[in-house]
Amino acid sequence: MKEPLKVACVQAAPVFLDLDATVDKTITLMEQAAAAGAGLIAFPETWIPGYPWFLWLDAPAWNMPLVQRYHQQSLVLDSVQARRISDAARHLGLYVVLGYSERNKASLYIGQWIIDDHGETVGVRRKLKATHVERTMFGEGDGASLRTFETPVGVLGALCCWEHLQPLSKYAMYAQNEQIHVAAWPSFSLYRNATSALGPEVNTAASRVYAAEGQCFVLAPCAIVSPEMIEMLCDSDAKRSLLQAGGGHARIFGPDGSDLATPLGEHEEGLLYATLDPAALTLAKVAADPAGHYSRPDVTRLMFNPNPTPCVVDLPDLPISSESIELLRPDIALEV
């Protein structure tokens, strides 16, 4: 990161379970950010087509109609809707870090898509481990999803939600000299009276600690639960007590953990703005670089596999002979 960068951090409600309408809103927010002079905009977790709150409200059998609709409204990267977003990024000259539900063949993944100011894909990642009931609908990422990307605006990285409570995953990111991190959150509207672990105090603190631990800028976009979503999902008083409207707590933190933008009210839609000064990175790293001069690899080290792990690996074409079988299966020897 060589030059100051103005960034925008989204706090808004998607058009729930409506892919095309949420793409429209995505582009509108991108246009607002670009008009304000921002060079990068960050969106919440599963912004498209919205976070599947219904998974937390009832039994899997009750959710099946909504699960089917969620599949249909999730984003395919090679699609007209995705091209609309990348074309808008190119037209506006804007970097975009988009949280979305990725539909790949018959599976869904909690994804983040990084697009550069030319509309080209910088990187695509998937949440390594879906959280709790999310695992009834979403698949998993692999080590290739724990990486940073060197760009003209800085070294970019991203994680989703409770990935920020995974110390080893965070350390893998810190070790790659991450400079601008997007910590994407869905909203802090769930189980408010039952547990602090899902609330804004704990999870906003996780984003702030990430900034201080990694000495990087952290953009923490956060969605809002709209009254329309409550009307759609909560058909009883019990469900309305579990999921409440609001929950927006978007933040931007400096590499020393300081607030760089004034938060919005939890029901308020808008964009948070801040100008990131690269000099702040140097000052923070001088004090503590946990994967550099402040580390003790002779005492503790992280084992990290950054390679993709596809379900099917094509073997090379080999002539059918005893030698080729021995090459593929050294435990088998055939007599000819």
From Swiss-Prot:
InterPro entries: C-N_Hydrolase, C-N_Hydrolase_sf, Nitrilase/CN_hydratase_CS, Nitrilases_CHs
Record note on disruption phenotype: Cells lacking this gene are unable to grow in medium in which the sole nitrogen source is either indole-3-acetonitrile (IAN) or phenylpropionitrile (PPN). Their growth is also moderately reduced in medium with ammonia as the nitrogen source; one possible explanation for this phenotype is that the disruption of Psyr_0007 results in the accumulation of endogenous nitriles that can no longer be degraded and which inhibit bacterial growth.
Record-annotated active site: 45, 127, 161
Enzyme class: hydrolase
GO molecular function ontology, one term from the record: indole-3-acetonitrile nitrilase activity
Reactions it catalyzes: a nitrile + 2 H2O = a carboxylate + NH4(+); (indol-3-yl)acetonitrile + 2 H2O = (indol-3-yl)acetate + NH4(+); phenylpropanonitrile + 2 H2O = 3-phenylpropanoate + NH4(+)
Pfam families per record: CN_hydrolase (PF00795)
This protein's record includes keyword Transport: no
EC number: 3.5.5.1
Keywords: Hydrolase
Function summary: Arylacetonitrilase which is capable of hydrolyzing indole-3-acetonitrile (IAN) to the plant hormone indole-3-acetate (IAA), and allows the plant pathogenic bacterium to use IAN as a sole nitrogen source. Is also able to hydrolyze phenylpropionitrile (PPN), allowing the use of this compound as a sole nitrogen source. This enzyme may represent an additional mechanism for IAA biosynthesis or may be used to degrade and assimilate aldoximes and nitriles produced during host plant secondary metabolism.
Protein name: Nitrilase
Organism: Pseudomonas syringae pv. syringae (strain B728a)
Phylogenetic classification of the source organism: Bacteria, Pseudomonadati, Pseudomonadota, Gammaproteobacteria, Pseudomonadales
